[in-house]
Amino acid sequence: MGYIKRIGLYISIFILIVMVAGCGKDNEIKEYSKETQIKNSFAKTLDMYPIKNLEDLYDKEGYRDGEFKKGDKGTWTLLTSFSKSNKPGVIDDEGMVLYLNRNTKKATGYYFVNKIYDDISKNQNEKKYRVELKNNKIVLLDNVEDEKLKQKIENFKFFSQYADFKDLKNYQDGSITTNENVPSYEAEYKLNNSDTNVKKLRDIYPITTKKAAILKLHIDGDIKGSSVGYKKIEYKFSKVKDQETTLRDYLNFGPSDEDS
């Protein structure tokens, strides 16, 4: 009888181990599946990179849903910004926003220069300079006396114009964060300095740290596609206080503004 009880105990333990292992495997599959979904969601736009001629977007349509009015061809919104802490307590943030309206085939936006202070009472100093896109060139619409800033604006390139994500599917073992209530999804990858996009960013921007960059793919909204919400890319080179260094990129398709 004791022998039979021991056999029964061993069988029970074995079944428990299999069940626990199975649950762990299920979680791994779900996590892997979510990572794949995030990549696939981003691939819909990142497959277009690099967009050498931004005016090509007039002939490209993104995800459409019920938020679009009848006859609205939609508007592409682009943003690229670079932020860096050059002295304690303040982060310099510069970049450009551009709206490409597929109805009017006009592209307007602005270049912004901002300082973000630890002391929030000082955060009232963003400057904007109006721009438009003509023949795939940025045209400055405001008078800018600072010649260095003027050249920076007129020669500005969005990350989407030179980035290449053909190896996106090869990024592995990302740290996945999800919040189904918002909903929001994020995949985070540690890159090395030999990464193609990292090397390009180091050539263009004053990135002083030699640390490997962290790539974040962030989605707010339906992971399968939605004109409500957004997708954002971040290359974070340093999170150290007073050494923060980040590149942000945003390319989304949505309903057109009636006033645009």
Curated annotation (Swiss-Prot):
Lipidation (N-palmitoyl cysteine): C23
Pfam family, one: DUF576
InterPro entries recorded: Csa, Csa_sf
GO terms under cellular component: plasma membrane
Matches recorded under PROSITE patterns: PROKAR_LIPOPROTEIN
Domain of life assignment: Bacteria
Lipidation (S-diacylglycerol cysteine): C23
Membrane topology: Lipid-anchor
Keyword Lipoprotein: yes
Signal peptide span: 1-22
Keywords (A to Z) from UniProt: Cell membrane, Lipoprotein, Membrane, Palmitate, Signal
Subcellular compartments: Cell membrane
Primary location: membrane
Family: Belongs to the staphylococcal tandem lipoprotein family.
Protein name as annotated: Uncharacterized lipoprotein SAB0389
